[in-house]
UniProtKB/Swiss-Prot annotation:
It is an enzyme of class 3 (hydrolase). One of its GO terms (biological process) is cytidine deamination. Binds 1 zinc ion. Zn(2+) binds at residues 102, 129, 132. The lineage of its organism: Bacteria, Pseudomonadati, Pseudomonadota, Gammaproteobacteria, Enterobacterales. The keyword Nucleotide-binding does not apply. This enzyme scavenges exogenous and endogenous cytidine and 2'-deoxycytidine for UMP synthesis. This is Cytidine deaminase. The active site is at 104 (proton donor).
Length: 294
């Protein structure tokens, strides 16, 4: 078990500990539960779906990287597939505050990058900030997305974001988590192709500036992130943050990164290169390349 989970794990009910122990035994537990695992945990612990999600929130919060605020937020995105995806907030010392990943963004991006097609609910241990409410409004689940908070009755995003502004106001039909493939040809080595594949998945209906990042760890593991734009612009999640989020959720550290590649168009309206390189260098990675999408 990764050390970050030990304190939260020790506070779980005994029957839930017994059921979770083999799942968490992998040091690189992927911070997600399959629908089958969720069903097993519900039956073993005697909990309904909502109660189980609340019980697991401390494990999600344990994934937080909060070197600045020391305020850990955990979230669980519940996919329509039945799979659950952990998320936690991330802060990056030496970068800018704008590079921060919020817990809800973390869980949602996690689900999206693992191929989830939509979300039924998000469970989080603190009320979503306005930034995250706006980020969630980009999803194909729309304002019907259920939000669960400890000690409160469940509500929909519509309740938390009244009179919402979103993609429909800009006549955008393809939403975040809808399947997208922008068709750029895969070239280069494995890491380069992974970055291009991530760029092909981008949600960028406002700038039409696709981008993707691939990070290679010293053990050969590759994590990718795709660009996710938002109708309100500022809640947009850059591709590097998506990749760093997956890397961290899987129990890796920034020092494990040995190489990074950004894929983007050289003539795009928005360019990720400077911000991507600056953040990676702040985290200790200097082997950074860029491939231009044709």
């Amino acid at each position: 078990m990764h050390p970050r989970f030990q304190t939260a794990f020790a506070q779980l009910a005994d029957n839930l500990q017994s059921a979770l122990a083999p799942i968490l035994a992998d040091h690189h537990f992927p911070a997600m539960l399959t629908a089958e695992q969720v069903s097993t945990l519900k039956n073993t612990a005697g909990l309904d779906e909502d109660a189980l999600a609340f019980a697991l929130l401390p494990l999600a919060a344990a994934c937080a990287r909060t070197d600045l605020s020391h305020f850990n937020v955990g979230a669980i995105a519940r996919g329509v597939s039945g799979n659950w995806y952990f998320g936690a907030n991330m802060e990056f010392l030496g970068a800018t505050m704008q590079q921060t990943v919020h817990a809800e963004q973390s869980a949602i991006s996690h689900a999206w990058l693992r191929g989830e097609k939509g979300l039924a609910a998000v469970t989080v241990n603190y009320t979503p900030c306005g930034h995250c409410r706006q980020f969630m409004n980009e999803l194909n689940s729309g304002l019907d997305l259920r939000i669960h908070l400890p000690g409160r009755a469940p509500h929909t995003l519509r309740d938390y974001l009244p009179d919402a502004f979103g993609p429909k106001d800009l006549e955008i039909k393809t939403l975040l988590m809808d399947e997208q493939d922008h068709g750029f040809t895969l070239t280069g080595d494995t890491l380069t192709q992974a970055a291009i594949t991530a760029a092909n998945k981008s949600h960028m209906p406002y700038s039409h500036s696709p981008s993707g990042v691939a990070l290679e760890c010293k053990d050969g593991r590759i994590f990718t992130g795709s660009y996710a734009e938002n109708a309100a612009f500022n809640p947009t999640l850059p591709p590097l943050q998506g990749a760093l989020n997956l890397l961290s959720l899987n129990g890796y550290n920034y020092a494990d990164i040995q190489r990074a590649i950004l894929a983007e168009k050289g003539d795009a309206a928005l360019i990720q290169w400077d911000a991507t390189a600056a953040t990676l260098k702040a985290l200790g990675c200097h082997n950074i390349d860029r491939v231009l999408l044709g």
